[in-house]
Regions:
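Terminal, contiguous helix-loop blocks that mediate binding/assembly
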Residues: 11, 102-104, 155
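A generic N-terminal leader/anchor concept
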Residues: 18-19, 50
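Active-site gating loop/helix substructures
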Residues: 35, 141-161
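Short, structural beta-strand-to-alpha-helix junction motif
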Residues: 56, 129, 133-141, 146-147
Length: 161
């Protein structure tokens, strides 16, 4: 999953999936918000439990898209993780990946100013946690289509995975 994006280009690796015929195309869209993704994860877990048919939540969708923390959840669902595993990810790794917001006005101002020059998150902690959870999984192994837009720092380049 963590390879050179240029060498592993989307056009070279993308596999066409059939368009569902005779039924609506269902998309689950998940927004960002850092550690607040734990709320989304809990809500999705409740939805999966309420369905009570034993099927994973991802099997109900043709595409799962997510930005930022929503992208992490989209990857988890698309690569076959249960909603319980996704909740566990946030409970176990969330505090290391998503630093707390500063309480003081000066701290908030500093965070705002520095956000223009560097990422708000510690990418090493995020990458280590994702490697632990996804190991050698690839997007090609996903059940539904997965869409995760990203902003590549410091090149200010947009990428869609």
């Amino acid at each position: 999953m963590f390879t050179d994006r240029k060498a592993n280009s989307l056009k070279a690796k993308r596999q066409q999936q059939p368009w569902p015929k005779g039924k609506p195309f269902k998309i689950l869209s998940l927004d960002g918000g850092g550690i607040k993704g734990i709320y989304t994860a809990h809500l999705l877990r409740q939805c999966e439990q309420n369905l009570a048919d034993g099927k994973p939540l991802a099997s109900y969708f043709d595409m799962i898209a997510g930005t930022s923390t929503g992208g992490i959840i989209a990857l988890g669902l698309g690569l076959g993780r249960t909603t319980e595993e996704i909740v566990s990810f946030y409970e176990t790794d969330g505090r290391r990946i998503f630093p707390p917001y500063p309480a003081s006005l000066l701290g908030k101002a500093w965070r705002f100013v520095t956000s223009f020059f560097r990422p708000l998150l510690n990418h090493e902690e995020l990458e280590a946690a994702l490697k632990r959870r996804f190991e050698d999984d690839t997007l090609g192994q996903a059940g539904p289509r997965i869409v995760v837009p990203a902003f590549m720092m410091p090149k200010t380049e947009i990428a869609v995975f």
